[in-house]
Amino acid sequence: MTYHNKEKQEVLQELNVQEATGLSSSEVKKRREQYGENRLRAKKSKSNWERFADQFKDVMILILLAAAAISFVVACVEGDPEGFFEPLLILLIVVVNAIMGVMQESRAEKALEALKSMSAPHARVLRDKAESIIDASELVPGDIIRLEAGDFVPADARLLQSVSLKSEESALTGESVPAEKDAGACPKADAPLGDRSNMVFSGCSITYGTAVAVVTATGMDTEMGKIANLLEGADDGQTPLQKRLAQLGKYLGILALAACAIIFVVGLANGLEVMEIFMTSVSLAVSAIPEGLPVIVTIVLSIGVQRMVKKNALIRRLPAVETLGSASVICSDKTGTLTQNRMTLVETYLDGETQANKLETKPSEEVKTLLRLGTLCCDGAVVFDGDKEQHIGDPTETAIVLAAHKNGMPKESLAKQYPRLAELPFDSDRKRMTVVCRMDGKLVAIVKGGFDVMEPLCTSGNLSQARLVMEEMSERALRVLAVAYKEIDKIPDEKSMMTLEGDLHFCGLVGMIDPPRPEAKAAVARCRKAGIKPVMITGDHVVTASAIARELGIMREGDRALTGAQVDAMTDSELDEHVESIAVYARVSPENKIRIVKSWQRKGQVVAMTGDGVNDAPALKAADIGCAMGITGTDVAKGAADMTLTDDNFATIVDAVREGRGIYANIKKVVGYLLGTNIGEVITVFTAMMLWHKTPLLSMQLLWINLVTDSLPAIALGMEAVESEVMTQKPKPKSEGLFAHGFGVRIVLQGVMFGLLALFAFMIGEKSTGTVAGGQTMAFAVLALSQVIQAYNMRSEHSLFKIGMFTNKKLNQAALLSIVLVLAVLFTPLRIPFGMISLSPQLYLEALGLIFIPVVIMECSKAFGLIKHQH
């Protein structure tokens, strides 16, 4: 139900309450039973045990558990104590992986808690004809409340009385200037939140004036509660990387099960023992599953997070790193994100001039006079504490005060030099403020207000030219105030104070704006170069938003600007049809923001949303990646976001995109490296079983290769430096698979190469030693060491000679350690539990020659253009 479009008496009648008496205690009790407490509902979060259980839903993990179970059964049947080592190792790997998953996913749901903390703890209420202070949670619709400057609004309420009332609503509406309120106003039913001047909203604060209001909504029914509902409803979803890895796991699982089934049938048909077939199946399952992949991807993402922290971007969810690299649209809030969230005086106009001029570093005496008069007619103040500024009061006033201060006229000094003797405070009816000061022995009345209300009060000055200048400044989204004055003989009595506001001399205009951040324009240009479309979504007026967007390069020729009301009038299909041509959305609601984000998502785009207010939180959560501001951002926005920009610098998001793209490229290298080796292992085990009914590699040997030998170089690959050209490429399409542009084919071919190499090594080893164990030892040595060397090939699609063979120091260290671990198994008693034997020096030399074959083949492929660098 809406109340802003109804007269006061009608609202009181609907809520069945009288302004003079308030609700009775019995009525309050009934309504509390009906509406509940004035609190926001908490969303139940998963326990760590539930999160731990969720880790075991992955297909790859389930297959590993099945392999462990089979190994355990075989060990029990055979009664071999050493046989239990293998299932215990697999189980340990699975549990460690699950614990890491819980650690990364278990983040507290802070958004709703932060919304709760914004609720007012107490309220001044009228009940049973008596005024009292109660806990805000006890309010019910129909309660009569009193508000004054400094109060938090405890619930949504319709104003009944107001005196010079202003409310800070930027968290809800995105407007940087406190909203003027008027109990007598009656906006239209479809008026956006920021235009409902006869309403105050829960969680906002009163910055000026006093009021009496009737509560219209409490708890989850308030505007803040609606946002809480949206936060609950917004789906966290999966990132593209999560979806692709999950899909990969399913494919590998199906492949492993199919191969195991074939081996089982072939083994039985050839009269092999069931236990031997089981153990071969376990080996095949282990070879098909890249056990270390989930953990290594997590580690690579964690490394990326550490890099981003150094660039002032704090990641809350690891997969968000990859999503950011895929971002193709950035929907950005204006206030505090693209702009400084601080009104600044940028232009002045003096009576008699032809146009407005930018405020110079060293202004003329006439401009100083304008600033002096304007400052004397301000209640706002700026307090300096070292390099920090604290702005107190109305932002337009603090802009004037700060401009005067920077030009050698601190307000404190002016107040002492020209003491204020009388005043007429600003109110919403007059829309102006008047003071009387003693200046150089004379009494001077100074009046400040909007030009439209000041023009009829002035009898001297070129007002027609001033109006033209004012209109031109307003078109450029400047907030314009006029300053006028007159000398008086004496201060009139209280009844005649209004006579001060007449027969004035027009002095000039001051133009203020919440200016763009200095670095924002360059950041927008870098986004466009990277193929990312910037879109402004704000609660501010469309003229202001469009002006800022044009200045920053967000809005270009042919682009459109829409209001929230226009978005409401469009169906989803209509919005989808026009969304690509709309650069600015103004006066939008939280629901509008979510619709805009989802419209882009339906277009197949990966959407990043930046913001700092409560009103941004639902869209931050609905977007593929939400980026909150760390300094000016509310706790609600930070709780809903995936990433926080700790310096509130819009340009930081561009650096984060660059890192995200680099990290995705590194993850792709890691996936390619691990899958290439796994495919080689599958081909080795499957082919040997089909052709010779033998197992060329035991499951223990495969686990050592996958989890020890391969994992260290894979992690180092994930630390590869970001390639220079990443920010000149377009974002990869949302539908683009992990194996696009022939990447999957190359992985399979590499797997075939490793498979043939291992089979050849097995044949040589078995023939030379006369034992299967000799063949397995030879296959292990060649496969393990050649895969370590292969990590260097995977660094880039450019030749190793072009990028420098040993320029990745982390990879050099990882490769050296992996080689040491392989040699430890080959040349120490550790080889015994791994089922290997000592080979002759001749065989070791032959193995050494075989391990460099992949390097030669890959370098030749790069040289002949078979592997092309993808732009």
Q: Where do the model's predicted regions map?
A:
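Conserved cytosolic headpiece of P-type ATPases
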Residues: 1-728, 738-739, 752, 780, ...
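Helix-coil boundary and interhelical linker segments in multi-pass alpha-helical membrane proteins
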Residues: 689-700, 762-775
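Membrane-water interface at loop-to-transmembrane-helix junctions
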Residues: 733-752, 772-777
